[in-house]
Amino acid sequence: MTPAELRALRERLGLSQGELAKRLGIDRNTVWRKEHGQRAITERDCIMLRQIERDGAS
């Protein structure tokens, strides 16, 4: 997953960076860094994002 894909997914789910961070168990600043290519998007992130997407943002 690319930084742009991460941001697009977050926005499609209607989540703020803070809300996504909470669901991923990371800091909001880390989400920002991942969306801007300053931190790697890990396999763990991808697995959790697929679960969030499957379950919906509610």
Model-flagged regions — what are they?
Residues 40-58:
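DNA major-groove recognition helix of helix-turn-helix/homeodomain DNA-binding modules
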Residues 24, 34-35, 45, 53:
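DNA major-groove recognition helix of helix-turn-helix
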